[in-house]
């Protein structure tokens, strides 16, 4: 939980004080992670909880375990409720904390229907930013699995998200492989009962149709959001990126602006609007 994380020499250090007993210290990693996710959620850090889960799943594909995650988190909340309640006699202020953990444990067991939300748009329109802003609001805590084409492309290439790839990594065959991987992961996550936010350009009508078909086959709700932005803003956004999983450049934006996008029947949103997030949330209801 959050009490077992400290900053040491400027770096986060996790400790559990259980090193004396391997039977306690060595457990299922997803169950261990559930403690941190639960505590972040309880402390009002839903976005951080979702981000943490997604970065873990990027590194270790445990999609099949997602069906158990709400139960794991509920168990962790119940444990914190019990431990905190036993301290309430000497520390009365902890009674409210124990009750809050107990209520959270109940809430975490409420079933949520899986759904697929897809965010498309040309480079520099803010797809990834919106995806992460929405993810913690969807499905069971700590929110949706975010599948980003930029991160998946780097993973398929065997490099870190921040590593820039050569031009051939964006050839048609390579891009087709990225979209195929994204859709396969989306299908697997939906099958596990989780919600998904997919983030990619989806410039081709066939790509948009294919991702919608994933939702239809899974029998879940589908929402497609298409972001549109002033070209000058798009150019400025990609030019300002540092250490970003996206390799898009101003030249890439210029090329994309000439695409024939076909008919876009997704909900179109002005990516430059101050109330973009609010409009996106409304589109999901």
Regions found by a protein language model. Name each.
Residues 218-238:
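Conserved phosphate-donor/acceptor-positioning beta-strand/loop module used by diverse small-molecule
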Residues 130:
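Hydrophobic positions on the alpha1 helix immediately C-terminal to the Walker A/P-loop
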């Amino acid at each position: 939980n959050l009490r077992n994380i400290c900053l040491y020499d400027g770096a986060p250090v996790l400790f559990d004080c259980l090193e004396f007993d391997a039977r306690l210290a060595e457990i299922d990693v997803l169950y261990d992670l559930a403690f941190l996710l639960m505590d972040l959620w309880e402390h009002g850090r839903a976005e951080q909880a979702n981000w943490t889960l997604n970065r873990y799943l990027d590194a270790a594909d445990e999609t099949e375990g997602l069906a158990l995650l709400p139960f794991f988190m509920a168990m962790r909340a119940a444990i914190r409720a019990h431990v905190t309640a036993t301290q309430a006699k000497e520390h009365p202020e902890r009674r409210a904390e124990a009750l809050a953990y107990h209520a959270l444990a109940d809430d975490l067991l409420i079933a949520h229907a899986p759904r697929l939300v897809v965010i498309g748009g040309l480079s520099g329109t803010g797809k990834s930013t919106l995806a992460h802003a929405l993810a913690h609001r969807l499905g069971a805590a700590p929110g949706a699995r975010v599948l980003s084409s930029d991160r998946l492309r780097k993973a398929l290439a065997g490099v870190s998200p921040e590593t820039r790839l050569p031009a051939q990594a964006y050839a048609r065959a390579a891009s087709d492989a990225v979209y195929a991987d994204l859709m396969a992961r989306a299908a697997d996550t939906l099958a596990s009962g989780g919600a998904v936010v997919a983030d990619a350009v989806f410039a081709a009508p066939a790509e948009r149709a294919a991702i919608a078909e994933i939702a239809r086959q899974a029998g879940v709700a589908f929402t497609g959001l298409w972001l549109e932005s002033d070209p000058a803003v798009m150019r400025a956004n990609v030019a300002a990126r540092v250490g970003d999983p996206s390799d898009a450049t101003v030249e890439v934006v210029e090329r994309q602006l000439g695409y024939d996008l076909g008919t876009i029947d997704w909900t179109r949103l002005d990516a430059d609007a101050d109330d973009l997030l609010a409009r996106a949330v409304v589109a999901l209801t």
